[in-house]
Structures are given as structure tokens and as C-alpha cells.
Amino acid sequence: MTFVVTDNCIKCKYTDCVEVCPVDCFYEGPNFLVIHPDECIDCALCEPECPAQAIFSEDEVPEDQQEFIELNADLAEVWPNITEKKDALADAEEWDGVKDKLQYLER
């Protein structure tokens, strides 16, 4: 089992989750983070740290966000690893809670 970053992280990219991950399994794109499913140890430390509430256990990913399971796996293979907290995107608060942001994902 793994944890999955979902839609609400797009254009927010808070990195509080990165700071608590004991195995450094987060990967960073221009406006989104993903979790590498083969590196995640299912410790659940990241989930409560996400201000956007965008992280779910794989078996609890909302039905309308199932595509993010595969998206996390795919993008973790090509994006660089992130191991330290950074500032959120400048307009993160404006985007937090906006629905259906997949169209804004920058790869």
C-alpha cells in the first residue's frame, strides 16, 4: 500500500509533507508533488501534515480521483526527488479547495 497525492495539491504545492517523510519518497514537479509508490512505507506521517488535505492512503483515494494513483507512479519516475520543505506556490491559498485542477498540472 502507498499514499497518493491528489488533485488539491495542484497549484498549491505545500511541502509540509516532505519534511516529515522518513524515506524521502516525494518527487517535485513545477506545481504538484507526487509520492513514489515503491518507496513509500505507508507510515501515514505525511497525510495529516498536508494543509490542502490532498494526501490519501491508496485504498481511500476518492472515486473521482483514482487516476492520481497511476499519475503519482508515472511522474515519480521522471521528476526530481524533494527532501526539504520549500515555500508553497505564491497563489496557493487562492487555489486551495478549487475542484478539478488536473487540467492545470504542469509536467
Curated annotation (Swiss-Prot):
Descriptive protein name: Ferredoxin 1
Necessary cofactors: [4Fe-4S] cluster; [3Fe-4S] cluster
Positions bound to [4Fe-4S] cluster: C21, C40, C43, C46
GO molecular function: 3 iron, 4 sulfur cluster binding; 4 iron, 4 sulfur cluster binding; electron transfer activity; metal ion binding
InterPro entries: 4Fe4S_Fe-S-bd, 4Fe4S_Fe_S_CS, 7Fe_ferredoxin, Fd_C, FdxA, RnfB_subfamily
Cofactor info, note text: Binds 1 [4Fe-4S] cluster.
Stored Pfam families: DUF3470, Fer4
Keywords, sorted A to Z: 3Fe-4S, 4Fe-4S, Electron transport, Iron, Iron-sulfur, Metal-binding, Repeat, Transport
Functional note: Ferredoxins are iron-sulfur proteins that transfer electrons in a wide variety of metabolic reactions.
